[in-house]
């Protein structure tokens, strides 16, 4: 079942440096996600990235690889689903690197990451040279669904500094101010 998912990342401009260009062209890429089907979603976003010619930054929705599956019948089903999506993490990074290199843009999106038995809603920011940075969502809306991250991510791209947030983290600006 495909569902239209609306949550977007908001990137706040923190400061401009002397080398900053006049503007940054940002593509906010939205899609009808195939819930839990990482392969189908990656194929779909591959097509969508091709239409982002001339963009400096390409931003995908929260959990763009799988959708945000909040209504599982039981905990076991939810864990099984997260394990499946988290197993794609290396492929997601590889695909985002390809998109960043091909487009020359900074590519930003989040997916599920698993480490030491804990799940994180991880935002990845991938540069055209293949390097990437990340932060894990700090304020998780539903307790127990994801483990909270403990660091903030500010990026500089094309001479402009950005601060990254995933959805609900915007409701807690003091966390950002303190980091």
PLM region spans:
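Bacterial N-terminal signal peptides
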Residues: 6-15
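Boundary at the C-terminal end of the N-terminal hydrophobic targeting segment
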Residues: 18-22
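Short, basic, glycine/proline-bearing loop/turn elements
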Residues: 27-36, 75-84, 159-161
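Active-site-proximal beta-strand/loop segments in catalytic clefts of secreted hydrolases
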Residues: 29-31, 61-63, 110-112, 138, ...
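N-terminal phosphate-binding loop and adjacent alpha-helix
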Residues: 30-48
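Cys-nucleophile CN-hydrolase/nitrilase-fold catalytic domain and related Cys-dependent amidase chemistry
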Residues: 47-128
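Active-site catalytic loop in hydrolytic enzyme cores
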Residues: 114-179
């Amino acid at each position: 079942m495909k569902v239209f998912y609306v949550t977007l990342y908001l990137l706040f401009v923190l400061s401009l440096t002397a080398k900053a260009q006049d503007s940054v062209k940002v593509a906010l890429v939205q899609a009808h996600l195939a819930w839990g089907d990482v392969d189908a979603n990656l194929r779909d976003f591959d097509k969508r990235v091709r239409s982002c010619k001339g963009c400096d930054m390409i931003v995908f929705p929260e959990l763009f690889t799988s959708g945000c599956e909040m209504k599982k019948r039981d905990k076991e089903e939810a864990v099984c689903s997260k394990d499946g999506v988290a197993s794609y993490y290396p492929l997601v990074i590889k695909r985002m690197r390809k998109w960043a290199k091909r487009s020359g843009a900074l590519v930003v999106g989040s997916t599920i990451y698993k480490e030491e038995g804990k799940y994180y809603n991880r935002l990845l920011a991938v540069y055209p040279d293949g390097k990437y940075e990340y932060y894990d969502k700090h304020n998780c809306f539903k307790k127990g669904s994801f483990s909270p991250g403990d660091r903030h991510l500010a990026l500089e791209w094309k001479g402009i500094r950005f601060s990254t947030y995933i959805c609900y983290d915007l409701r807690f600006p003091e966390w950002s101010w303190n980091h």
